[in-house]
């Protein structure tokens, strides 16, 4: 049975990550009888600056175990000043590191997580969203080829201004998630 994990890195518990994207993904899994759990890096007080020597890094070991057992991994992050959240950057450094997520053989990276289905959900303020922004480029040319080999990146600039616009955008995002997550299943 497939197992999903949702990793949320958004400090706002009332934001789109917690109120729309994560619940929608979790609902899709539960409707199909699949297990899906949520990791909230901010609620867990994950320290993106921790090192292997600190006691705070025990949580990184726990996250590694969860990643190992998951078939589908969903990363949700807001984009600040052109990059993913510091919590998610710390997660990449501490959890998805060399020796766990990939190895280097003859100066080439060899993924250990290449069989996982991976999805990234990035949401921006309207002013920062461009197709080829810094967060997208970091994932597309650094994180994904090294660790996962392939994945899907969703980008959104959802704003909470006008209710009619908000409803249309939410419906569009939800339909996109449904079609991408379970397109051939």
List the predicted regions and their residue ranges.
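Residues at the starts of beta-strands that form the adenosine-phosphate
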Residues: 2-3, 35-37, 116-117, 152
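Short, solvent-exposed amphipathic alpha-helices that sit
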Residues: 17-29, 134-149
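A short beta-strand-loop structural module common to alpha/beta enzyme folds
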Residues: 34-45, 155-160
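Helix-loop-strand module that forms the ligand-binding subsite of alpha/beta enzymes
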Residues: 58-143
């Amino acid at each position: 049975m497939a197992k999903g994990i949702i990793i949320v890195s958004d400090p706002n518990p009332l934001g789109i990550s917690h109120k729309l994207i994560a619940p929608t993904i979790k609902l899709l899994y539960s409707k199909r009888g699949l297990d899906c759990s949520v990791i909230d890096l901010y609620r867990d007080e994950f320290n993106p600056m921790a090192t292997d020597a600190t006691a705070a890094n025990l949580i990184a070991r726990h996250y590694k175990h969860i990643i190992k057992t998951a078939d589908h991994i969903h990363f949700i992050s807001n984009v600040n000043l052109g990059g993913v959240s510091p919590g998610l950057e710390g997660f990449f450094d501490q959890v998805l590191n060399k020796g766990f997520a990939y190895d280097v053989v003859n100066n080439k990276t060899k993924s250990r997580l290449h069989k996982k289905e991976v999805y990234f959900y990035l949401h921006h303020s309207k002013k920062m969203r461009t197709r080829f922004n810094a967060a997208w480029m970091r994932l597309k040319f650094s994180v994904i080829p090294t660790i996962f080999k392939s994945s899907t990146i969703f980008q959104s600039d959802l704003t909470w201004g006008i209710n009619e616009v908000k409803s249309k955008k939410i419906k569009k995002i939800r339909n996109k998630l449904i079609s991408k997550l379970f397109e051939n299943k």
